[in-house]
């Protein structure tokens, strides 16, 4: 899989066109699926990355939030892109953001309780009336596709109230008592993340989101979904939502959730269990291990690279990443893997049998952008294309098959062999985070050099 964007991807409605034009190259490299960014209108209009969703039914079709197109293009360009990818044999993974909404059209008055941001179970006020932008009428769409209007009873909390200092306000209504139940007690309860938090206990909301899922598939015919921020949403909701989506479309739609909890692999497994295996999850612990290994250099014991990871615990439900739009430099979860280690990290996810690897867009194409760091200083970032990434992707296609034997017997060098099958010869891989060395393994099938593959 390729994550076909990053936080600072080009604007000006170019992404869909450029992705469509890259389809042949991506297919040649063995990319079998592309995860595209949120495609619906966001509060930030044509400048938004897409994680502040406003109208799920506006795929770049209506004049809303100051634009018809999203940052990435209009609806026609989007559908042309997805159709071309699928015609080339590349599956389309769409980004689903159902945790929150932003950019309400009107304010409403309702009762709420202010809570401690570090412990959302601790109230810091009695119930009182606030006013906030919780009314969504979508005037630019004029009820096309759906007449549903959102009001304060559709949300469990907000982070903004008129005439109040900023904070987290738990909304009082008849569809739920307090926050929705989560599987972990981080921050007391981490249901609330940002903006207007959707209350998925409301049966009218659940029906609207189920209906929207079918509508979205009818429009795009996508093959899979990436589910944003599942850490902050009830596993019961997504178990139901995915069941309905698959039933309504009569397709075994692939699903991967974002539950970002580095070092807490048991929470990831608990979420998978609670959703009855209906989705995979990104292996945030493995990404953290890559980050730490790249920082520590030769002091890192490579034999521990898969310790406490989902890829080790539950490989069939693990999607492996080296970096993503949240861990890249200058982002909230910044934990980038250093340049020298990235070829090793990609070998570890592309050439082994466990996990479903996901390549990050800048690692394949490079990126250059400017933003402020945590101290407020402007920084220019250059992300180079990962050395040998094309060769590693081709090696996966040609050689990474068959039974795997591991040689994890040295702190600074790892090796493994793949024994191949009737159509593929197999391979041997050796990695080192120190000086060059040797490792005795039964057979070496190829090496990767600047000239390409050299078989032995």
What kind of region is each of these model predictions?
Residues 6-9, 195, 327-329, 367:
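A short, flexible beta-alpha/helix-coil linker loop
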Residues 1-91, 99, 106-109, 144, ...:
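N-terminal structural segment of carbohydrate-active enzymes
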């Amino acid at each position: 899989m390729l994550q076909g964007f990053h936080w600072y991807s080009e604007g000006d409605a170019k992404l869909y066109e450029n992705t469509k034009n890259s389809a042949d190259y991506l297919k040649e490299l063995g990319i079998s699926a592309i995860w595209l960014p949120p495609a619906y209108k966001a509060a930030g209009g044509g400048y938004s990355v897409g994680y502040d969703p406003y109208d799920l039914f506006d795929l770049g079709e209506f004049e809303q939030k100051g634009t018809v197109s999203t940052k990435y293009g209009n609806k026609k360009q989007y559908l042309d892109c997805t159709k071309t990818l699928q015609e080339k044999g590349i599956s389309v993974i769409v980004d689903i953001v159902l945790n929150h909404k932003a950019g309400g059209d009107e304010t409403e008055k309702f009762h709420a309780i202010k809570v401690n941001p570090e412990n959302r179970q601790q109230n810091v006020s009695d119930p009182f009336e606030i006013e906030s932008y919780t009314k969504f009428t979508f005037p630019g769409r004029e009820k096309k596709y759906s007449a549903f209007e959102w009001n304060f009873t559709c949300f469990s909390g907000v982070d903004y109230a008129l005439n109040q200092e900023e904070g987290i306000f738990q909304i009082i209504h008849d569809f739920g008592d307090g926050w929705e139940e989560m599987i972990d007690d981080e921050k007391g309860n981490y249901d609330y993340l940002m903006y207007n938090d959707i209350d998925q206990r409301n049966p009218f909301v659940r029906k609207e989101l189920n209906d929207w899922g079918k509508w979205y598939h009818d429009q795009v015919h996508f093959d899979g979904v990436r589910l944003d921020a599942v850490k902050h949403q009830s596993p019961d909701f997504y178990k139901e939502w995915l069941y309905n989506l698959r039933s309504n479309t009569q397709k075994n739609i692939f699903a991967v959730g974002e539950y970002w909890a580095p070092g807490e692999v048991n929470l990831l497994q608990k979420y998978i269990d609670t959703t009855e295996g209906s989705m995979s999850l990104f292996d945030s612990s493995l990404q953290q291990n890559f980050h730490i290994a790249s920082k520590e250099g030769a002091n890192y014991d490579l034999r521990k690279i898969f310790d406490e990871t989902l890829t080790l615990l539950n490989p069939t439900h693990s999607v492996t990443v080296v970096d993503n739009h949240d861990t890249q430099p200058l982002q909230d979860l910044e934990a980038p893997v250093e340049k020298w280690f990235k070829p090793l990290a990609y070998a570890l996810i592309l050439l082994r049998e466990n996990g479903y690897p996901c390549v990050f867009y800048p690692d394949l194409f490079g990126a250059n952008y400017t933003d402020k760091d945590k101290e407020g200083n402007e920084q220019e970032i250059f992300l180079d294309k990962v050395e040998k990434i094309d060769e590693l992707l081709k090696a996966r296609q040609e050689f990474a098959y068959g039974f795997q034997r591991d040689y994890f017997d040295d702190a600074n060098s790892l090796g493994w062999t793949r024994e191949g099958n009737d159509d593929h010869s197999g391979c041997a891989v050796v990695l080192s985070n120190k000086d060059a060395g040797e490792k005795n393994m039964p057979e070496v099938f190829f090496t990767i050099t600047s000239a390409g593959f050299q078989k032995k």
